[in-house]
Amino acid sequence: MNTVTMKNVEFGAGVPKICVPICGKTKEDVLEQAKIILDTPADIIEWRMDWFEQVENTASVVEMAKELREVFKETPVLATFRSKKEGGELEVSTEYYVELNCAVAKSRYVDAVDVELYTGDKEVETIVTTAHENGVKVIMSNHDFFKTPSKEEIISRLCAMQEKGADIPKIAVMPQSKKDVLTLLSATNEMVEEHADRPIITMSMAATGIISRLAGEVFGSCLTFGAAKKASAPGQMGVNDLKTVLETLHKSL
């Protein structure tokens, strides 16, 4: 299993890393949330571009990314435009989604971009190539806010991301039962043991899936999400509580 390094943060080794989202609408909101996060044990920041009111202007987005880079000099920044169909705030055309992600990657103000697996094969390839040409990592993702697919389907999607050049494949699914949480954990374990040659991120959402956000070191997920102020998905814990639990588990493993 290869690890992935952004700044001085190594993903896929030791305690799962903590990602804290920024979901500000205005430039002031974004910077205010950024300053709050500076005082937390966040390992990486996710800037949710789909929340940003100027997201349909690439120049404004790149300028905002530059300001975030100035705040987070040593902390990796992941830029994410989450589509409406996968739980995001805004829908844009596929063409603009590609343009936006490529512009942010070319700016080199971020360390990684999130690319949704089902954007389209050609479009995914364009963003992945552009990101890698500019030294930017790709977290490729898929989110199902309605159900938990079968173990085989979860593994299939993660393998597809790996084949398409993801530095870190990611899947988040919604449990309808505790058994669904076990399905996600079992898929994670099998993916890591039999298929993955790089770190992966998996989670079962909402309160039912909370154990999946805490047990990454046991089953093989390299990253978990915690909230400093505003949670970006159901089931996110506060970042300080999350850090305490992850460190406590680590000591016992």
What are these language model-derived features?
Residues 9-14, 70, 105, 162-163, ...:
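Solvent-exposed alpha-helices and their adjacent loops that cap or buttress functional pockets
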Residues 2-4, 12-133, 146-147:
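Active-site beta->alpha loop and helix N-cap motifs at the rims of alpha/beta catalytic domains
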Residues 117-253:
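Catalytic alpha/beta core domains of metabolic enzymes, predominantly
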Residues 9, 13-17, 24, 110, ...:
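Generic signal for short, ordered secondary-structure residues
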Residues 1-10, 251-253:
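Short, Lys/Arg-enriched, disordered terminal segments
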Residues 6-9, 67-68, 96, 151-162:
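Short N-terminal signal/transit or membrane-insertion segments
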